[in-house]
Amino acid sequence: MIVKAKFVKGFIRDVHPYGCRREVLNQIDYCKKAIGFRGPKKVLIVGASSGFGLATRISVAFGGPEAHTIGVSYETGATDRRIGTAGWYNNIFFKEFAKKKGLVAKNFIEDAFSNETKDKVIKYIKDEFGKIDLFVYSLAAPRRKDYKTGNVYTSRIKTILGDFEGPTIDVERDEITLKKVSSASIEEIEETRKVMGGEDWQEWCEELLYEDCFSDKATTIAYSYIGSPRTYKIYREGTIGIAKKDLEDKAKLINEKLNRVIGGRAFVSVNKALVTKASAYIPTFPLYAAILYKVMKEKNIHENCIMQIERMFSEKIYSNEKIQFDDKGRLRMDDLELRKDVQDEVDRIWSNITPENFKELSDYKGYKKEFMNLNGFDLDGVDYSKDLDIELLRKLEP
């Protein structure tokens, strides 16, 4: 079977398993060449299979600390109808490379929102793994089941200050389109907060603390985004922004309790605009990111996920310097993105963008390549003309 990238309504339907393997290896290779850092030895990542979560796992394992890791993610393998999800293979191949290095890489393919999953992870920590030094919450999910009430909540990417129409990029057709987004209802805002806010992160921390699974002075981090005013209406001032504000509010509560009980700390890291499975489908964001990529690459300050996370650990969290937070207690890894010279140039290009010239004025080529890489396509060193053995792939277990 030969696997090619097939688009369905702007999504890439299939994945290339060995392209995913190459992408994991590329990130590992970057970490091996980076300056490195001394950091946590035992790490739990919820949302570990792609984007910032995967980069976090790779960084702590191969970027210096040689950490043992637990990853929680909800993914599917090969079936008669589909070859599986990218995260499924990212988990498999991360584990392969970690084991070669003598590291524990335990995967839980479970619903992170469920109490049963939390119980399984905690039991493993207490029985086999040992107390964790770092807990990273990097979950991006479309739905959440509240196992206490049985209610199922669905997140929506909507505005809250009236309807919105803005340009976005259709990577299937390589063109700019206008995307209309309606204003959210009170119920939709609350459901999005339930799914993408800090409630589940807080529940994880409460359970881990109650069961004595944190080491002394342990750290927990959740990832967020603020971005440019160009994306405010759909992001920071939209349903997602309300959820992220909740995440930041929960960080303060978690931090107070961890600090009091174990001398630990909790905070949100505000990261830069990058192509991830979550961000690629936010209206306006793809065009903004493509322009930003061009500007930051020209200034030699562009970072992809693994570069950003490696810098976060080596220069901010586990450096010899005291961590600098903003006035709301957040770590600002979007510092380079929001530099005045960067944003001024982004604004200049944005004002001149048209459907005819956007490929020339932005780094659309680089943006699309990263988008394709998410599912294992368009990577150097992968033979995409080679038949894949589906039966062999079915035998692979994360």
Swiss-Prot record:
Q: Which residues cross the membrane?
A: none
Instruction: Note the biotech application.
Output: Used in the biosynthesis of medium-chain volatile alcohols as biofuels engineered by microorganisms. The switch from the native flavin-dependent enoyl-CoA reductase used in the production of n-butanol, a key second-generation biofuel, to a flavin-independent trans-enoyl-CoA reductase from C.acetobutylicum leads to an order of magnitude increase in product yield in engineered E.coli.
InterPro entries hit by this protein: Eno_Rdtase_FAD-bd_dom (IPR024906), Enoyl-CoA_Rdtase_cat_dom (IPR024910), FabV-like_NADH_b (IPR050048), NAD(P)-bd_dom_sf (IPR036291), Trans-2-enoyl-CoA_reductase (IPR010758)
Query: What residues does the record give for site: Plays an important role in discriminating NADH against NADPH?
Result: 75
Which annotated residues bind NAD(+)?
Answer: 47-52, 74-75, 111-112, 139-140, 244, 274-276
Q: What is its EC number?
A: 1.3.1.44
Tell me, which GO biological process terms does this entry list?
A: fatty acid biosynthetic process
Q: Its Gene Ontology molecular function terms?
A: enoyl-[acyl-carrier-protein] reductase (NADH) activity; NAD binding; trans-2-enoyl-CoA reductase (NADH) activity
Subunit notes for this chain?
Answer: Monomer.
Which protein are we looking at?
Trans-2-enoyl-CoA reductase [NADH]
- State the organism named in the record: Clostridium acetobutylicum (strain ATCC 824 / DSM 792 / JCM 1419 / IAM 19013 / LMG 5710 / NBRC 13948 / NRRL B-527 / VKM B-1787 / 2291 / W)
UniProt lineage: Bacteria, Bacillati, Bacillota, Clostridia, Eubacteriales
